[in-house]
C-alpha cells in the first residue's frame, strides 16, 4: 500500500515582485517501509514538497494522501493528530538550546500530554537507540554536529511516527559523520519499519541508502524509479549531472 501519495500538487507563492511557482503538478507515490530519495539542485522545490507532505505548507492545488487519507480534508485537530505520525529532521537540528538532551527528546511527548515519568523512560530508550544514552544530561551546545542530529532523530521518533521526513539532514555534516547518520537511519527503518523520505542534493546519500528516487528541477519531477535503474539508464539532463 502507498504510504504517501502526492497527486498533482502545485504550490504558488505571491510577493511584491509577482508569483513564484515552487511546485508544478507534482505526482509521486512512496510505498510503506521504503527509503525514498528526492534529489535536485538548490531551488528545485525539494523542501517545499517535503513540507507539503505534512501540511506545514498547504498546496495551492492537488492532494496529499497518507495511507489513503487526504490531509486537505482534515480539520485542524485531526491534522495535528495526523502529524504525530510524521516525524521530521532538519539540516540545522532545531534543538532547544536551553534544554538538556533528554528534555529535547521528551518535548514532543509533553505536547502529546504524556506524563513526565513515561516521557522520560521512552526518551532514555530512544537515546540508547541513537547511541547517546550517556549524553542525556548534556546540552546541545556541548555536542558535535553528528550528535545533535542523533538527538533530533530521537526526538522525531518520540511520537512513534510511521513516516520520517529528512530535509537535508546530512548536508551540514562531514562525510564520516554523514555515513554514521545514514547507517542509523537504515537501522531505524529496519527496526521500526518506518517509511523514510530523504531530501538531498547529495548523490552519495541517495546511492548509499535509498531504494527509489525522484529527481526534481524547477518545481517539477523529471524522473522517478529505482536508484539502480535511474542511474544505470538516465533519461533526463538533470539525472546525467548526477551520474
What feature does the model see in each segment?
Residues 54:
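Helix-to-loop junction immediately C-terminal to a conserved catalytic motif
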Residues 206-208:
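A short, surface-exposed alpha-helical micro-motif characterized by mixed small hydrophobic
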Residues 224-225:
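ABC ATPase "signature
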Residues 158-162:
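A short, proline-enriched helix->beta-strand linker immediately N-terminal to the Walker B motif
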Residues 175-177:
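Helix N-cap at the start of a conserved alpha-helix in ABC-type nucleotide-binding domains
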Residues 69-70, 106, 110, 117-134:
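Conserved ABC ATPase "signature" region
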Amino acid at each position: 500500500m502507498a504510504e504517501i501519495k502526492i497527486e498533482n500538487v502545485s504550490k504558488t507563492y505571491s510577493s511584491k515582485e509577482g508569483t513564484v511557482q515552487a511546485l508544478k503538478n507534482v505526482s509521486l507515490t512512496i510505498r510503506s517501509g521504503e527509503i525514498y530519495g528526492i534529489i535536485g539542485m538548490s531551488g528545485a522545490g525539494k523542501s517545499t514538497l517535503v513540507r507539503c507532505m505534512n501540511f506545514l505548507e498547504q498546496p495551492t492545488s492537488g492532494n496529499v494522501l497518507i495511507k489513503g487519507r487526504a490531509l486537505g480534508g482534515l480539520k485542524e485537530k485531526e491534522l495535528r493528530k495526523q502529524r504525530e505520525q510524521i516525524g521530521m529532521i532538519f539540516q540545522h537540528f532545531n534543538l532547544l538550546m536551553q534544554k538538556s538532551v533528554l528534555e529535547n527528546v521528551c518535548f514532543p511527548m509533553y505536547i502529546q500530554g504524556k506524563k513526565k515519568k513515561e516521557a522520560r523512560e521512552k526518551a532514555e530508550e530512544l537515546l540508547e537507540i541513537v547511541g547517546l544514552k550517556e549524553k542525556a544530561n548534556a546540552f546541545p551546545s556541548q555536542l558535535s554536529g553528528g550528535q545533535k542530529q542523533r538527538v533530533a532523530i530521537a526526538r522525531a521518533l518520540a511520537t512513534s511516527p510511521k513516516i520520517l521526513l529528512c530535509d537535508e539532514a546530512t548536508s551540514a555534516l562531514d562525510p564520516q559523520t554523514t555515513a554514521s547518520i545514514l547507517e542509523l537511519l537504515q537501522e531505524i527503518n529496519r527496526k521500526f519499519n518506518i517509511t523514510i523520505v530523504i531530501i538531498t542534493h547529495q548523490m552519495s546519500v541517495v546511492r548509499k541508502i535509498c531504494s527509489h528516487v525522484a529527481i526534481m528541477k524547477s518545481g517539477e519531477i523529471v524522473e522517478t524509479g529505482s536508484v539502480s535503474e535511474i542511474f544505470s539508464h538516465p533519461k533526463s539532463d538533470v539525472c546525467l549531472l548526477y551520474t
